[in-house]
Amino acid sequence: MAPRIAVVGAGTMGAGFVRLFADAGYRIRVFDVRPRAAAAAAEQREGAVAAASLTEALAGADLCIEAIVEELEPKQALFRELANVAPAGCVLATNTSALSVAAIASAVPEAVRPRVLGTHFFNPPDIIPAVEVVRGPETGDEAVETALGLLRRAGKVAAVLTDSPGFVANRIQLAMVAEAWRCLEDGVATAESIDAIVSGSFGFRLFAYGPFAIGDFNGLDVYEAVLRSLASAYGERFSPPRALLEKVGRGELGVKTGKGAFDYTPEEVVELIRRRDEIFERLAEIKKTL
């Protein structure tokens, strides 16, 4: 039997969830306090149904994903309602970008809190692969495994995180955004130039690799030296992190030493570099068409 998904909130993200899970063959019920919005979201895919109430939306659901306004009090109020109507075993997920999962879960009875977690998708959620599965302090293993299974079966790249401000993506992304604005304020470059440099340099690499893999290619000792130089100019926000200093102190500098953030055999290094260059050449050709 196909999994049942309840989507609460039929805005941009909720409508994307309908497309995502319907395309995976799941049964979808979507509810919104605006009936027309729920109907419009459901009409995107055959088999999706606009529910007339929360009770109807959650009937038999394996997973409920909330996608309402990004404010704590409305989310807490909704989760109190969800806790009253959700079937036993239904995982209650909040699609928050930065709010505390623990704070949202605090609104429901203690017996329900093990079923509450975060699922931070990225817009458009039916296209962008990653989902941050955020485990609150009271989230149970079963809820995490259920969410991971349903998300991965739908083709998502789902990773488990602890409940921390900004999670991973926004903590890193917004640090970059803030620094880009500082470059603009300081007169270093125009907005157009900054975007061109980012999208054509480390942004280009980030399509295929995360910051740790890129760091291992570039050399962690190089990162340390550059960070020290930047810290002398811009202050403590660029100070090398302790974990990076410890790696460099042990001579674990990345691909060139066979160990950095990750471990590498000599054979793996050869294949990694070959594969990296192949990917970048293909990306460069695609970028020319944009």
Q: What does each model-identified segment do?
A:
Residues R182-T190:
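C-terminal regulatory/interaction module of P-loop NTP-utilizing enzymes
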Residues P3, A24-Y26, R153-K156, T162, ...:
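NAD(P)-dependent Rossmann-like dehydrogenase/reductase catalytic/cofactor-binding core
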Residues V8, F31, A51, A67, ...:
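Structural motif
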Residues P35-A38, Q173, V177:
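Structural/interface elements that position substrates and couple domains in central-metabolism enzymes
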Residues V91-D163, N170-R171:
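Rossmann-fold dinucleotide-binding core
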Residues V33-R36, G47-L92, L99:
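Rossmann-like NAD(P)-binding element
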Residues M1-G47:
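NAD(P)+-binding Rossmann beta1-loop-alpha1 motif at the extreme N-terminus of oxidoreductases
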